[in-house]
Amino acid sequence: MTFVEIKDKITAILSGRAHYYEGYNIQDIVLPTRVLSDLNIKNLIITNAAGGVNSNYSPGDIVALKDHINLTGNNPLIGKNIDELGPRFPDMSEVYNHKFRKIAETVSKDFFDYKEGVYAWFTGPTYETPAEVNFAKTIGADLVGMST
């Protein structure tokens, strides 16, 4: 974790992440996010590579997430509640901040065609089967992947 100042804001930069398919438990995977929360960091910009299942996408497209579908059967909030982390049953209706997505859309206009999509998270490490890709499309996913 590296800290830099960008336009009078302290910014934390993290490189890489643990993946569920590497055998890490879900609590270890979310540890960096919880550290950032303890540091009172309220906003994250996270990137990953994903497979596009939306026929309107092309390889290399940059897509802002508007929602996700967790197909792993795991959730870091399962288990004893940690009150300091927030509510036991958090509202997930606006996980991907609409205001930030609008800013991204505005900024991207001069550089690339802005797209938004829904990400379906699979456990990996195998790539998704054709049936899984079809299922993901059927339930509303635009992207599939195994990144956490």
Task: Report each predicted region and the residues it spans.
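Glycine- and other small-residue-rich loops at beta-strand/loop junctions that grip anionic moieties
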Residues: 21, 89, 93, 121-125, ...
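Charged, glycine-interspersed solvent-exposed loop segments at helix/strand-loop junctions
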Residues: 88-108, 118-120
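Active-site/ligand-binding-proximal alpha/beta "capping" segment
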Residues: 106-142
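Predominant activation on well-ordered alpha-helical scaffold segments within soluble catalytic domains
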Residues: 30-38, 101-105, 134-137
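Histidine- and/or cysteine-centered catalytic micro-motif in compact active-site loops
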Residues: 16, 50, 67-69, 123, ...
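Metabolite-binding pocket within alpha/beta catalytic cores that recognizes anionic/polar moieties
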Residues: 1-92
